[in-house]
Design a protein with these regions (language model features):
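Short, Gly/Pro- and small/polar-rich lid/capping loops
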Residues: 26-41
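Surface-exposed patches in mature extracellular/periplasmic domains of secreted proteins
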Residues: 63-69, 98-101, 213-221, 392-407, ...
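Active-site-surrounding "flap" and adjacent substrate/cofactor-binding loops of secreted or lumenal enzymes
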Residues: 31-32, 48-120
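Intrinsically disordered, low-complexity linker/terminal regions across diverse proteins
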Residues: 259-262, 281-285, 309, 349, ...
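Noncatalytic, helix-rich "gating/capping" subdomain that lines the substrate-entry/channel surface
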Residues: 95-379, 383
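Short amphipathic alpha-helical segments with coiled-coil-like heptad repeat character
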Residues: 56-70, 206-216, 412-414
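Gram-negative bacterial Sec-dependent N-terminal signal peptides
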Residues: 1-23
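Extracytoplasmic/secreted envelope proteins and their assembly/folding machinery
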Residues: 47-54, 58, 81, 85-92, ...
Length: 473
């Protein structure tokens, strides 16, 4: 179904100024302002608002607007994202911005756009990953290799992350959650309604292992799906995993090793570069002993085949068309309902944005968000903060003590508009126009090691969770 805000929001988006959405990269320039006003043609006034408000507000637009073949939904936020995508394309296909970052984002885009080279290389870019996997001789070594998953194409049966400690928001913490599934969630393995998709997934595994020249693709695929099904049975549901209290279980690595034996936790953490970590937050805690036991019980050949498939699956977007097409047929069409693959330039834009989003954003801001526009919005927000303070003062039902606390909370408000005050430093990142698969791993490694290095530092309040070219930034 289409995802669309009600027509009342249309005026806001029209005021934002939408440029023509064509297939060609637009000329790089300044802000573009489109038509102003409320688009009443998006409504369907033949329907009473009280009977069906969605049709009343959006019925005209809904009837006239098909979902593009390369998307699974569409709405005004998608329109804005399409415009930003075209603008970034113009930046990446134009002359590089001065400096090393400008050269790097162009190299990343060029690497992805070189489809001919990708087809010549085939599976060659992942040969080192598969060679390292074939060299594994013990389950302890396998756990160490899985530890590399945040910064490589490798995968793991437990997912590791670094973020703000939810119980101590001035610090960062390492969190570990359940993982190991190649399908979207446990229901795809356990519910009969997903049986066809599970079967398609197993066929997909055969295809990918065959393309990667892994031994016994048919037998390995069955073993992999059986292994993941056992993990699914042990895993928490999505609803359970959203409980902030149940998913906060701090432990030391030694305590975790006793709590969930059967998995080499210290080698796993060392593989992730977390050699000095003495505290981790365990998410779905009751699943951990079960998943660790499943790992301990699995043959090493199954674990290696499982890892091989997930390496290929993670790397597929950066390999030859055979890998790309096989992945899209299952992950795009079968699992997501997306009829057509996105154009290569769109995927290349996403690649550059994903790897060096702030470097792209810095150029984007210079082209499309002039300082005077930011100054005006900053001034407007300051007035809103003042007005909010005045509203607090005028509340009859709020006590003086509560008002004091409300003002203290208001004073701590951090306003972030348009782009960060401190841009990310990409000087340590190496990018090559000749190897997009290596670039993809370099992007992951750069971000992960950046997180590891700041683990014992205070939380950076200036950091942004999105790039300037992201809709809603």
């Amino acid at each position: 179904m289409k995802h669309v805000p009600v027509a009342a929001a249309l005026a806001l988006f029209m005021a934002a100024g939408l440029a023509s959405n064509t297939g060609a990269a637009p000329a790089v320039g300044g802000p573009v302002t489109g038509d102003w006003g409320f688009d009443a043609t998006g409504m369907d006034t033949s329907v009473r608002a009280g009977d069906d408000f969605f049709k009343y507000a959006n019925g005209g637009w809904d009837v006239r607007t098909p979902i593009p073949a390369d998307k699974t939904g569409y709405g005004l936020d998608y329109v804005l994202a399409d415009q930003a995508e075209l603008r970034v394309r113009g930046i990446l296909e134009g002359a590089p911005a001065p400096g090393a970052d400008g050269a790097k984002i162009h190299a990343a885009y060029a690497a992805f756009m070189d489809e001919k080279r990708a087809n010549v290389l085939g599976a060659t870019p992942i040969a080192p990953d598969l060679a390292a996997l074939r060299a594994v001789r013990t389950k302890t070594e396998m756990a160490a290799l899985m530890g590399r998953s945040p910064m490589s194409f490798e995968s793991a049966i437990f997912n590791t992350g670094i973020g703000v400690d939810q119980k101590a928001p001035d610090k960062y913490a390492v969190s570990i959650g359940q993982g190991g599934l190649g399908l979207p969630n446990r229901d795809y393995y356990l519910q009969p309604s997903f049986a066809a998709k599970k079967a398609a997934y197993q066929t997909y595994i055969v295809t990918m292992l065959t393309l990667a020249h892994w031994q016994d693709p048919q037998g390995s695929a069955k073993a992999i799906v059986d292994f993941e099904t056992r993990i699914a049975e042990a895993s928490w549901t999505r609803a359970e995993s959203r409980d902030p209290d149940k998913t906060f279980n701090p432990m030391s690595p030694a305590e975790l090793a006793k709590f969930a034996p059967g998995f080499a936790w210290r080698p796993f953490l060392n593989g992730a570069g977390l050699t000095g970590v003495d505290r981790v937050i365990v998410r779905q805690n009751t699943a951990f002993p079960k998943i660790a036991a499943i790992y301990a019980d699995a043959p090493l050949t199954t674990l290696k085949a499982w890892e091989a498939f997930h390496v290929v699956d993670a790397a597929a977007p950066y390999l030859s068309d055979a890998f790309v097409d096989a992945q899209f047929d299952v992950r795009g069409k079968t699992l997501s309902g997306q009829p057509s693959q996105r154009d290569r330039w769109k995927r290349a834009v996403a690649f550059a944005n994903g790897g060096m989003g702030e470097a792209v954003g810095r150029v984007y801001v210079a082209k499309y968000f002039p300082p005077d526009a930011k100054a005006k919005i900053d001034a407007l927000v300051k007035e809103l903060v003042v007005a909010l303070g005045q509203r607090i003062d005028g509340l009859d039902w709020m006590s003086a003590e509560t008002k004091t606390k409300a003002h203290a909370k208001l004073a701590q408000l951090t306003v972030k508009i348009g782009y960060p005050s401190v841009w990310r430093d990409y000087s340590a990142l190496k990018v090559s126009a000749a190897n997009m698969a290596a670039d993809a791993e370099a992007f992951d490694r750069f971000e992960w090691m950046r997180d590891v290095k700041r683990l014992h530092k205070p939380v950076d309040r200036t950091e942004w969770g999105m790039t300037p070219q992201t809709v809603n930034a």
